[in-house]
Amino acid sequence: MATKAVCVLKGDGPVQGTIHFEAKGDTVVVTGSITGLTEGDHGFHVHQFGDNTQGCTSAGPHFNPLSKKHGGPKDEERHVGDLGNVTADKNGVAIVDIVDPLISLSGEYSIIGRTMVVHEKPDDLGRGGNEESTKTGNAGSRLACGVIGIAK
């Protein structure tokens, strides 16, 4: 059983990063940094497929094995892959430090082999008042992505 995973984020533009995942008890700790972002919040999600053959678009929708509506990471109603937002500073750097109780590195909610995506816009956490908000959080285009793999 995997206890650690890693993801290297790359896109067509300047956005890149490395994200580490570590199982700790009933949670997964997500840490790392992303550079090349515009200042402010950016949606940060695990998407269903580990397919990046067509860039980040072939990663499919948010990882949602429970068939729920989109929400924030602290909401009862959320996709498993909904990790909310990362916040970039004025230099375009986002430091990631998330503890999530729903994602896993093993079992039916495992994120291994799926794609991590950082988005262009803030995730409205399903509170945007339109249908797209309940699917994607209106987070916009996919700036960078990478497949999550088992780490040592």
Curated annotation (Swiss-Prot):
Subcellular location: Cytoplasm; Nucleus
Modification type N-acetylalanine: residues: A2
Keywords: Acetylation, Antioxidant, Copper, Cytoplasm, Disulfide bond, Lipoprotein, Metal-binding, Nucleus, Oxidoreductase, Palmitate, Phosphoprotein, Zinc
Residues noted as binding Zn(2+) in the record, renumbered to the chain: H62, H70, H79, D82
A cellular component annotation (GO) from this entry: protein-containing complex
Catalytic reaction list: 2 superoxide + 2 H(+) = H2O2 + O2
An annotated GO BP: response to superoxide
GO molecular function, one term: protein phosphatase 2B binding
Residues reported to bind Cu cation: H45, H47, H62, H119
Top EC category: oxidoreductase
Family: Belongs to the Cu-Zn superoxide dismutase family.
Subunit structure: Homodimer; non-disulfide-linked. Heterodimer with SOD1. The heterodimer CCS:SOD1 interacts with SLC31A1; this heterotrimer is Cu(1+)-mediated and its maintenance is regulated through SOD1 activation.
UniProt miscellaneous comment: Chemical modification of Arg-142 reduces activity by 80-90%.
Known function: Destroys radicals which are normally produced within the cells and which are toxic to biological systems.
Protein name: Superoxide dismutase [Cu-Zn]
Gene that this sequence comes from: SOD1
